[in-house]
């Protein structure tokens, strides 16, 4: 085993050397203030912010595929959830004493409110058009069965009522009520089975690909914005004045050009890690990546689709990563409703759906190989889970579906391969390396280059993530009166928390719902529930989480 590891490592280092040596000779040079690498929602969001903050800055976006929003941002390559912790049970972990921690749920919800405000502002500006084309009201539900899980959901519901962000959530253990909310989930279910559900009417389904296309189309209307498709970054070199020379190859005709940029953003999804490494900044040495893909079962049968209007999330099974929770979702893609169930984890060494099988190997370096090995050794349960997922048969996946849709018929469903999610592995002084769930902005000390690594919650929090990037790399400008005024016009709640302020929460939800054409009714009284039994939990090794 050691010999195999050594051989693979040598190959990886060799591939990196070849990659770095094979610089394309550029025939011309272009200058730009901002270079956006990747045509996904992150680059589109950052470009939209900067267009308002500094309209005179020139921007260039390069994308290796023939169109924008074709990788992870594509509506078919993600679950399309407006992640706000209304139903995702992994955001409310149970403490050892049995109580429920809501800190992460509050943070996720606050972040999504920023996204809603950002999108609403762009609709008012005419940048985003026809909100129904990219965001729709789809109630968010949690659904569990079994005494322990029902008790957990009771405790979760009670805990979330402490936050103004979760007012309006409903709770029920009544079969008839839950059937009214989600008939597809309840029909054919054992009437004696102990079940519970929560439902929040203001949940959303979001087509991030459509948002991306509309944002970039608006940017293209300005003469100082350039979009270059079928263009792949081959090299990044820092200049003496701290600007960057980036070599970009035209994949159609084989030519190349140099782009000289004052600031570079690497928003290339799974490819971001390799490009960050190519930049040579010391901060990149702390990171490695591990790719995990996802599959969904899809139904377009009208009898199924018209019988389900909700996103219904369950609870991850014991020993599985919390984020692997199964869910059966209404999606609205290009104006058409479909139902998805999953995800089922898949494995490929590609960092992108349209990537190379050598991606994982070529990102392995002398700096990150040890953290990767530590993560593998310390997370055997995660390895077992991934192996078990890869080995699933068609029958296994169908049986998993029937737990959420008892009357499902095989002929109504097909299997769809969604996008790749590169998980962050970061060097850790104590453990050697840790698997980090979430996204992370990595930048140099000078604030001239930044990359976004990670996968979750991803697109639904693009607006707050890019806001964080602005604060990190343009700190002096962000603190200026001009930028402060503009940012508060884009995001009215910027600089303050909505949680705990009922009036402010209702005001922002009312405003964004009206502009985005979403359903919103002021919350009514809290549902009465049986008192949860806060049972002490067994202290178990935490299963590392991953994003699918």
UniProtKB/Swiss-Prot annotation:
Cofactor: FAD
Keyword flag Transport: no
A molecular function (GO) term: 2-hydroxyglutarate dehydrogenase activity
Pfam families: Mqo
Pathway(s) annotated for this protein in UniProt: Carbohydrate metabolism; tricarboxylic acid cycle; oxaloacetate from (S)-malate (quinone route): step 1/1
Enzyme Commission designation: 1.1.5.4
Entry keywords, A to Z: FAD, Flavoprotein, Oxidoreductase, Tricarboxylic acid cycle
Keyword Cell inner membrane (UniProt): no
Entries under InterPro entries matching the protein: FAD/NAD-bd_sf, MQO
Reactions mediated catalytically: (S)-malate + a quinone = a quinol + oxaloacetate
GO biological process per UniProt: tricarboxylic acid cycle
Family from the record: Belongs to the MQO family.
PANTHER family per UniProt: L-2-HYDROXYGLUTARATE DEHYDROGENASE, MITOCHONDRIAL
Family matches, as HAMAP family: MQO (MF_00212)
Protein name: Probable malate:quinone oxidoreductase
Gene field: mqo
């Amino acid at each position: 085993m050691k010999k195999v590891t050594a051989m693979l490592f040598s190959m990886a280092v060799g591939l990196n050397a070849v990659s770095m040596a094979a610089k394309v000779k550029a025939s011309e040079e272009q200058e730009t203030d901002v270079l956006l690498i990747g045509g996904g929602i992150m680059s589109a969001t950052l470009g939209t912010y900067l267009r308002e903050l500094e309209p005179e800055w020139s921007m260039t976006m390069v994308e290796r595929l023939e169109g924008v929003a074709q990788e992870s941002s594509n509506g078919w390559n993600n679950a399309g959830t407006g992640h706000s912790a209304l139903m995702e049970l992994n955001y409310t972990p149970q403490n050892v004493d049995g109580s429920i921690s809501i800190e992460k749920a509050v943070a996720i919800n606050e972040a999504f409110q920023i996204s809603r405000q950002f999108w609403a502002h762009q609709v008012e500006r005419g940048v985003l058009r026809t909100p129904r084309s990219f965001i729709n009201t789809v109630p968010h539900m949690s659904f569990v069965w079994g005494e322990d899980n029902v008790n957990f959901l009771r405790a979760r519901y009670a805990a979330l009522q402490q936050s103004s962000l979760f007012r309006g959530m409903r709770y029920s253990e009544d079969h008839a009520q839950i059937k009214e909310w989600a008939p597809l989930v309840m029909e054919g279910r054992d009437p004696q089975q102990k079940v519970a559900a929560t439902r929040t009417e203001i949940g959303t389904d979001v087509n991030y690909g459509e948002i991306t296309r509309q944002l970039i189309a608006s940017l293209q209307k300005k003469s100082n914005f350039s979009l270059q498709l079928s263009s792949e970054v081959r090299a990044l070199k820092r200049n003496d004045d701290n600007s960057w020379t980036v070599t970009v190859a035209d994949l159609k005709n084989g030519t190349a050009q140099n782009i000289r940029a004052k600031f570079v953003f690497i928003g290339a999804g799974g490819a971001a890690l390799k490009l960050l490494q190519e930049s040579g900044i010391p901060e990149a040495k702390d990171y490695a990546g591990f790719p995990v893909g996802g599959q969904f079962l899809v139904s377009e049968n009208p009898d199924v689709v018209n019988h389900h209007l909700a996103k219904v999330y369950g609870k991850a099974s014991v020993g599985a990563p919390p984020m692997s929770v199964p869910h059966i979702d209404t999606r609205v893609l290009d104006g058409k409703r479909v139902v998805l169930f999953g995800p089922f984890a898949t494995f490929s060494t590609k960092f992108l759906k349209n990537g190379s099988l050598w991606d994982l190997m070529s990102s392995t370096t002398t700096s990150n190989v040890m953290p990767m090995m530590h993560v593998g050794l310390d997370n055997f349960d995660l390895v077992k889970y991934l192996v078990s997922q890869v080995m699933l048969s068609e029958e296994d996946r169908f049986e998993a579906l029937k737990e959420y849709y008892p009357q499902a018929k095989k002929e109504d469903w097909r299997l769809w391969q969604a996008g790749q999610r590169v998980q962050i592995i970061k060097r850790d002084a104590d453990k050697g390396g840790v698997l980090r769930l979430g996204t992370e902005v990595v930048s140099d000390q000078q604030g001239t280059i930044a990359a976004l690594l990670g996968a979750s919650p991803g697109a639904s929090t693009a607006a707050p993530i890019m806001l964080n990037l602005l604060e990190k790399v343009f700190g002096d400008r962000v603190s200026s009166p001009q930028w402060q005024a503009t940012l508060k016009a884009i995001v009215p709640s910027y600089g303050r928390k909505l949680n705990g302020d009922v009036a402010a929460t209702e005001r922002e939800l009312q405003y964004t719902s009206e502009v985005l054409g979403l359903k919103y009714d002021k919350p009514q009284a809290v549902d009465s529930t049986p008192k949860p039994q806060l049972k002490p939990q067994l202290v178990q090794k935490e299963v590392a989480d991953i994003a699918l």
